[in-house]
Amino acid sequence: MVHQVLYRALVSTKWLAESIRSGSLGPGLRVLDASWYSPGTRQARKEYQERHVPGASFFDIEECRDTTSPYEMMLPSEAHFADYVGSLGISNDTHVVVYDGDNLGSFYAPRVWWMFRVFGHRTVSVLNGGFRNWLKEGHPVTSEPSRPEPAVFKATLDRSLLKTYEQVLENLQSKRFQLVDSRAQGRYLGTEPEPDIVGLDSGHIRGSANMPFMNFLTEDGFEKSPEELRAIFQDKKVDLSQPLIATCRKGVTACHIALAAYLCGKPDVAVYDGSWSEWFHQAPPETRVSQGKSGKA
């Protein structure tokens, strides 16, 4: 059963429940809870300890990142990522299923899906509908901690799926890539503040289009169909046959653009990891666009 879905970006709650019932969890199939919430709201690790998908390990994105960077969620090194996921029992032969508990149905899970892909691991899927629908459908949960046997994971960075500040700056001149921002429209325009952060005005990179990631999800928290997703890209005049860079505030919801494009048959969307957090502090003022009070971000 597992081998039929190794390269699928999404797996259903029904499929995962059947896999757990059939005893498929182990070195060949691992489940990760990648929940993260803004400070002062929900506590991701505490909620995981109280209830999670049976056999799931907690993927702490605060630990699996570049903690030396001044920006929020920058990728860790190859060695850091390899050691971290290896400690969760994941090898290069493991099919990884990622979910989170966000009320939208999915928030941080696509970021972890992309992290695995950018480090060379293709057998990774997002649980469609997330923990929200796992609970709604009455699938089993447990508070029992997962203790997988450590595994060896070799990480190889795929630079084609990652863009740096310098590359995005160069792209303003070359225009080789389309640039799409996944934040809510008000933050993109600069008319609404960036939440939970001081010293970061809202706005966007000059020349970027706006595709709020929430539009990729149904009201019930599932990914929309490939046909619906293609229509969203077409409506924003984003050509899926051409190179594409996704950006947001810190490289998280940009991964929803990468996932949506993947579901439309485009697996090569690159994510600007530093995104607006880095751009705001590094880029020339004329490359930052805002309709806020100052007119510039």
Curated annotation (Swiss-Prot):
Spans annotated as Hinge: 144-159
Superkingdom of the organism of origin: Eukaryota
Pfam families in UniProt: Rhodanese
Keyword Lipid biosynthesis listed: no
Location of Phosphoserine modifications: S38
Residues that bind substrate: R187, K250
Glycosylated residues (UniProt): S35
EC number: 2.8.1.1
Protein's GO biological process: rRNA import into mitochondrion; rRNA transport
Modification N6-acetyllysine occurs at: K14, K136, K163, K175, K224, K236, K237
Functional note: Together with MRPL18, acts as a mitochondrial import factor for the cytosolic 5S rRNA. Only the nascent unfolded cytoplasmic form is able to bind to the 5S rRNA. Formation of iron-sulfur complexes and cyanide detoxification. Binds molecular oxygen and sulfur.
Domains as described in the record: Contains two rhodanese domains with different primary structures but with near identical secondary structure conformations suggesting a common evolutionary origin. Only the C-terminal rhodanese domain contains the catalytic cysteine residue.
Stated name of the protein: Thiosulfate sulfurtransferase
Gene of this entry: TST
